[in-house]
Amino acid sequence: MSFLTNFLLGLGLAMDAFAVSMSSGTTVRPFKVSDALKLAVFFGGFQALMPVLGWVGGSAVSGFVSDYAPWIAFGLLAFIGGKMIYEALYGDPDGKVNSLNYSMLFLLAVATSIDALAVGISFAFLGTPILEPVIIIGCVTFVMSFCGAVLGYRIGHFFENEVEILGGLILIGLGVKILAEHMDWI
């Protein structure tokens, strides 16, 4: 695969991570550069790791991934999105949210990188070497996640709770989109 193909694949896979990073950037107060780096490392790392796992697992997990991955992603994103909405409506009146604990980052990273697992499986079926695509996918996701978190922080303080509700709705919407595509509704 060419660099351009791998780069475009990385962009496509990074869109969910970008949206989630942007949502996270709107809610975390006080926001630090280290928060954006945490998001970028988790999302970039998982987007790079999941294709490797898919490639190694190959056809052994293809049935599971195709049957259950959209449901898992939907469940995780709906839960986290619902939690964000709840916290916006009933949480700390100062608007300070620490949604970047490691368990939350892990769940978000898994939810946004399940599609990368399927890409790895397809690479295995096609006999495509994995190293270059994985490096590019991870780097693109790292940069997009970092930028998304910073952008979310920059615009988030203008709207406070409304942006957190919007972020929660975006996560739920991503989950619904993943599920709808799996069910051939769209």
Swiss-Prot record:
Membrane protein topology class: Multi-pass membrane protein
Q: Name one GO cellular component term.
A: plasma membrane
InterPro entries cross-referenced by the UniProt entry: Mntp/YtaF, Put_MntP
Q: Which Pfam families match?
A: Mntp
Per UniProt, the keywords (alphabetical) are: Cell membrane, Ion transport, Manganese, Membrane, Transmembrane, Transmembrane helix, Transport
Q: Does the keyword Metal-binding apply?
A: no
> Can you tell me where the transmembrane regions are?
1-21, 41-61, 62-82, 105-127, 139-159, 163-183
Tagged with keyword Thylakoid:
no
**Major localization listed first in the record, in broad terms:** membrane
GO function term, MF aspect, one: manganese ion transmembrane transporter activity
Report the subcellular localization: Cell membrane
Quote the function comment for this protein: Probably functions as a manganese efflux pump.
* HAMAP family the UniProt entry points to: MntP_pump
Provide the family line. Belongs to the MntP (TC 9.B.29) family.
Q: What is this protein called?
A: Putative manganese efflux pump MntP
Q: Recite the lineage of the species.
A: Archaea, Methanobacteriati, Methanobacteriota, Stenosarchaea group, Methanomicrobia
